[in-house]
Amino acid sequence: MSRTLKSNEPEDLAFARSFAAEGPRSQAAAGLVFFWAGLLYGLQTLTYGVVEAGGFALSASQGLALAIAPTVPFLAIVGFVGWRDRKAKKGVVTRTLNASYTSAGLINLIIALIFGWLATSRQSMVIWLLHPIVICAMQGAVWYAACAIRRKLWLGLVSAGWFVTTVALTLLITHITGYLLVLGAALLGLMAAPGFMMMRLAAREQGRE
C-alpha cells in the first residue's frame, strides 16, 4: 500500500505544480472566450426575445445581420486566443481543461448539425429549440468538470445554474418569448459573467506572483 502511494506521489506533485503555474493563464484565456461568447450571443438572443414579444420588427436584411453579427467578432477572439497561446507550454491542468472544452465544442457542433437537419426536414421549430436545451446541459457538465478539477464552489454554482436553465427551457419550449429571454439571460449570467470573473481572478493570481 505504501509502495503504491509513493509511486503516485510524483504525479500528484506534478499536477499541483502545473495547477499553480498554469492555472491563471488557462483561466484567463478561457474567461476571455466565455465572456465574449456569453455577451455577444446573450445580447443576440435577448434581442430575438424582444422582437418575438412585439417590441420592434426586423427587416429581412436586419434579421440576417443580427443572425451573423456575433459570429465574426467571436471567431476573431477565438483566433486571437489561439494565436497568442500557440507556443505556450501546456501541462496536465491546461490539457485536461482544454480537452473538456474541445470535446464539448465538438459535441455541440455535431448536435447542431443533427438538430438543424431534423428541424429542416421535418419543418419543425420545436426540434430546433431542443438544440439549445442540450447545449445548456452540456455547459452544466463542462462547468461541473471545471469545478471538480479546480475545486471552486462558484464553478459548481454556475454548473447548477446551467442545469436549472435546461429544465426551464424545457418547460418554456412552447412559449418562444419566455424561452428566448431565459436563454439570453443565462448566456449573460452563466457565461459572460463567469468569464469576466475568471479573467479577474486570473489577473489577481498573476499579480501575486
Q: Across the structure, where does each feature detected by a protein language model lie?
A:
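Hydrophobic alpha-helical transmembrane segments and adjacent interfacial helices
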Residues: 44-49, 107-119, 142-145, 162-175
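Residues within membrane-spanning alpha-helices of integral membrane proteins
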Residues: 31-34, 38, 71, 106, ...
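Selected alpha-helical membrane-embedding segments in polytopic membrane proteins
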Residues: 25-114
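Membrane-proximal helix-loop-helix units in multi-pass membrane proteins
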Residues: 96-155
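C-terminal ends of transmembrane helices
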Residues: 77-95, 141-148, 192-199
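Terminal transmembrane helical module of multi-pass membrane proteins
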Residues: 142-209
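N-terminal juxtamembrane cytosolic/stromal segments of multi-pass membrane proteins
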Residues: 1-30
